[in-house]
């Protein structure tokens, strides 16, 4: 029985690990009947949409065409470059984040002037003639503000067909959030009916990678559920989401670009692979009706910045759900909040990890004690178990009955050593996710040679031509795992025991490329477990 329970534990851990990394729930989006059409209740002419401005009878007078121009916006947090093509965002440089963990490394740049996929929040329309990439004219060549200040940048498109579209970006010097008012002025003699669309293209402003650990792609929050799509998941046939949309955007491991609904201003989001092979997201407003001489405003909020859980939560609309921590999110996010709480006091995320590890070990001590005692009890009755197996080697039913009587007589629960450990598995995976995908640990130093808790321990670099770096932390982790294994009571036969000795070696190689913050947690957890076992041994022997 002990062999079977041990095997069950190992298989459970393996299945949880592989399944949580490689698989996600299947999404069931609605297939659209036609491209780019939003379905919603009509809005009365002359009324603002989703908290927009009051109706206006006159549109700004500008030429129908204008020379392409770029506008630079500088705040305390970022430098953004907008262009007149679609009134779109081309690139954004995050001043507080660096590409590499080096003193002279450049700041993180999202997007590129040379990348045709980088135009984000480009405006077009369905139902009236505003094509993608339509020329807009900016009211400034540069906008600069300090923290706490608010300033605007206005792009205007004169269609030459009796209507004008104006995009008003409102920036805050101390926020990654941007307000976008899209105004449609109708100077024609007939009503103007259609939908306003904001277009984003992947990879656009995110770092496009595709692996188990880099979950870059499209994310949106629809009907209280997070939906995600990678480029490979979307064909030329589009996917349509149109239920209770809160936000939509593109994200990678650490950064997010999103458009947020303001009072229901997102009616649908359509995903498709465009002719250039990029993943395109079209965010459509409810259908608007602009009567002659009036205007309608569609309001959105934008976000381009780090996936810091506090920053995301402050934006509202459940934007913090973009920090997808897998099946154990309900445990992982409280652990992440706890990690940040201790960081505020100690000023070092490595120390905060140590504090959390000690607290978790103390909380689980009763379970560990019970598990260890149960294994000790099982070890004591092994000679009697062996005798029963020999006695009933040709009578399986008789052997099972005798074994159960042996358990009952000695008050031993064969699952007593397994169940307490299974309870701790979700906590481990939750902490694993929190440490693996937390931007807080990105380039965060610990002490001594560990300068980046989000990267592997690479003190010794690549040795002996191996394709990975080597450092002391994973080696120490493997050594402590071996010591812990030798101290743990075992009822396995010699062959199984020898096979189990390979586990520390396997885990050491696995952890060579893991974030050093996670290896630090595992190492300290092993050390505390060794201390626990020494203490419990003393209690049991006494």
From Swiss-Prot:
Residues 33-64 are annotated as: Disordered. This is Membrane protein insertase YidC. It comes from Pelobacter propionicus (strain DSM 2379 / NBRC 103807 / OttBd1). Pfam families: 60KD_IMP, YidC_periplas. Required for the insertion and/or proper folding and/or complex formation of integral membrane proteins into the membrane. Involved in integration of membrane proteins that insert both dependently and independently of the Sec translocase complex, as well as at least some lipoproteins. Aids folding of multispanning membrane proteins. Belongs to the OXA1/ALB3/YidC family. Type 1 subfamily. NCBIfam families: PRK01318.1-4, yidC_nterm, yidC_oxa1_cterm. The gene is yidC. One of its GO terms (cellular component) is plasma membrane. One of its GO terms (biological process) is protein transport. Interacts with the Sec translocase complex via SecD. Specifically interacts with transmembrane segments of nascent integral membrane proteins during membrane integration. Its main location: membrane.
């Amino acid at each position: 029985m002990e062999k079977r329970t041990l095997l069950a534990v190992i298989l459970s851990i393996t299945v949880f690990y592989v399944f949580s990394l490689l698989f996600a729930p299947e999404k069931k989006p609605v297939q659209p009947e036609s491209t780019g059409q939003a379905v919603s209740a009509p809005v009365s002419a002359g009324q603002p949409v989703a908290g927009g401005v009051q109706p206006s009878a006159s549109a700004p007078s500008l030429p129908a065409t204008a020379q392409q121009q770029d506008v630079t916006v500088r705040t305390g947090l970022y430098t953004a470059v907008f262009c007149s093509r679609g009134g779109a965002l081309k690139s954004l440089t995050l001043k507080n984040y660096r590409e590499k963990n080096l003193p002279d490394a450049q700041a993180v740049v999202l997007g590129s002037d040379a990348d045709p996929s980088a135009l984000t929040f480009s405006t077009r329309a369905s139902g009236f003639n505003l094509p993608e990439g339509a020329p807009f004219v900016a009211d400034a060549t540069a906008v600069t503000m300090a923290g706490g200040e608010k300033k605007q940048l206005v792009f205007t498109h004169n269609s030459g067909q009796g209507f004008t579209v104006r995009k008003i970006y409102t920036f805050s010097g101390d926020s990654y959030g941007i307000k976008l008012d899209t105004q449609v002025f109708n100077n024609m003699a007939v009503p103007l009916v259609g939908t306003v669309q904001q277009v984003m293209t992947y990879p656009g402003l995110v770092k496009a990678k595709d692996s188990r650990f880099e979950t870059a792609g499209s994310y949106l929050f629809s009907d209280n559920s997070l939906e995600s799509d990678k480029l490979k998941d979307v064909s030329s046939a589009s996917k349509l989401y149109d239920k209770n949309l809160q936000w939509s955007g593109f994200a990678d491991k650490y950064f997010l670009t999103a458009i947020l609904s303001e009072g229901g201003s997102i009616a649908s989001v359509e995903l498709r692979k465009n002719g250039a092979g990029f993943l395109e997201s079209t965010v459509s407003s409810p259908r608007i009706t602009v009567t002659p001489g009036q205007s309608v405003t569609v309001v959105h909020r934008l976000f381009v910045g780090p996936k810091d859980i506090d920053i995301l939560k402050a934006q509202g609309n459940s934007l913090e759900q973009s920090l997808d921590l897998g099946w154990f999110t309900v445990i992982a996010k409280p652990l992440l909040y706890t990690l940040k709480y201790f960081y505020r006091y100690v000023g070092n995320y490595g120390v905060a990890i140590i504090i959390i590890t000690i607290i978790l070990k103390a909380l689980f001590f009763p379970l560990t004690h019970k598990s260890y005692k149960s294994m000790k009890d099982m070890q004591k009755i092994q000679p009697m178990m062996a005798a029963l197996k020999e006695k009933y080697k040709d009578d399986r039913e008789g052997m099972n009955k005798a074994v159960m009587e042996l358990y009952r007589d000695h008050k031993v629960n064969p699952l007593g050593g397994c169940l307490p450990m299974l309870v701790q598995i979700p906590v481990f995976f939750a902490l694993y996710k929190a440490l693996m995908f937390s931007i807080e640990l990105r380039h965060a130093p610990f002490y001594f040679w560990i300068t980046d808790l989000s990267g592997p321990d690479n003190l010794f670099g690549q040795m002996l031509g191996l394709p990975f770096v080597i450092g002391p932390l994973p080696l120490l982790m493997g050594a402590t795992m071996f010591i812990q294994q030798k101290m743990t009571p075992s009822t396995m036969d010699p062959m199984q025991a020898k096979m189990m000795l390979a586990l520390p070696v396997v885990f050491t190689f696995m952890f060579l490329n893991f974030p050093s913050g996670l290896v630090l947690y595992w190492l300290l957890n092993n050390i505390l477990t060794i201390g626990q076992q020494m203490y419990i041994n003393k209690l049991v022997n006494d």
